[in-house]
């Protein structure tokens, strides 16, 4: 039986493209035919919900009833994947809350697959975020994402820097999100549809649209590049991990040898 998976997308800095990454993931999971539900913590407007209204609910991640709404239903929902788009500044508090409620421990025991996409900013301060995040991870699958939004220039990590920070998370894997042509990004934003829907020249309702052939081509190439990154790191295999068979409860029953006749 496939374990429920929780995918967290966050970063403590704003303007690093967390929701853009979340949108590419929702399209990717749909393409892989994985049932997914999403929670948008950008209260009250809900940016992710604007693009994926059918699978997304807006919640206040600091509000205990909303935490219950997400995590109490992880095992009972029909969705294989629960995706959470964490608003800027709330990644560390959210991880702290997950540790306090026992979620991190449940992931460590193998009851839940926990995946974290940590969207890094371009400054050296992001390295401190990595250190802070490492304290909460447990056995989570940790992806460090460089999102080249707005021609962002990322600092280069030399060997000493890598040794000092990255060794704290031995299983960390890097993912690169390229920049989408600005006009294409603007048109998808104006259309308020998923990237895959824009590529298919459809409106949110499913009706045919008249988006630019050129811009759809740019979005298709960009999204294919990102999906290739997700394939490279084996994201689908991670999400579809199965529960380990549990040992029998109690002592094994004795084997009774039947006498030969």
List PLM regions with ranges.
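Catalytic cores of phosphodiester-bond-cleaving enzymes
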Residues: 1, 125, 137, 210, ...
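Nucleotide-state-sensitive switch-loop elements of NTP-binding domains
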Residues: 2-8, 22, 31-97, 101
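Short glycine-rich or small-residue beta-strand-to-loop segments that form or flank ligand, phosphate
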Residues: 7-10, 116-117
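Walker A (P-loop) phosphate-binding loop of P-loop NTPases
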Residues: 14-15
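Conserved catalytic-core segment of NTP-binding enzymes
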Residues: 89-189
């Amino acid at each position: 039986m496939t374990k429920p998976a929780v995918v967290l997308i966050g970063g403590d800095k704003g303007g690093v493209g967390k929701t853009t990454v979340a949108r590419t993931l929702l399209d990717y999971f749909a393409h892989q035919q994985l049932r997914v539900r999403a929670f948008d913590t950008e209260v009250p407007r809900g940016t992710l919900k604007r693009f994926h209204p059918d699978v997304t609910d807006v919640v206040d991640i600091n509000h205990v009833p909303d935490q219950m709404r997400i995590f109490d239903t992880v095992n009972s929902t029909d969705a294989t994947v629960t995706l959470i788009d964490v608003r800027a500044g709330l990644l560390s508090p959210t991880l702290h809350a997950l540790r306090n409620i026992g979620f991190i421990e449940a992931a460590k025991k193998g009851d839940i697959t926990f995946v974290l996409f940590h969207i890094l900013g371009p400054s050296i301060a992001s390295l401190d975020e990595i250190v802070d995040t490492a304290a909460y991870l447990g056995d989570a699958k940790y992806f460090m994402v460089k999102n080249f939004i707005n021609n962002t220039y990322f600092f280069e990590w030399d060997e000493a820097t890598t040794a000092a920070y990255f060794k704290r998370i031995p299983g960390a894997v890097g993912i690169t999100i390229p920049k989408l042509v600005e006009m294409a990004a603007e048109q998808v934003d104006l259309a308020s549809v998923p990237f895959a829907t824009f590529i298919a020249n459809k409106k949110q309702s499913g009706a045919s649209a008249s988006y630019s052939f050129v811009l759809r081509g740019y979005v298709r190439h960009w999204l294919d590049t990102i999906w290739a990154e997700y394939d490279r790191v084996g994201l689908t295999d991670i999400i579809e991990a199965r529960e380990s068979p549990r040992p029998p409860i109690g002592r094994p029953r004795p084997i009774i040898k039947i006498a030969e006749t």
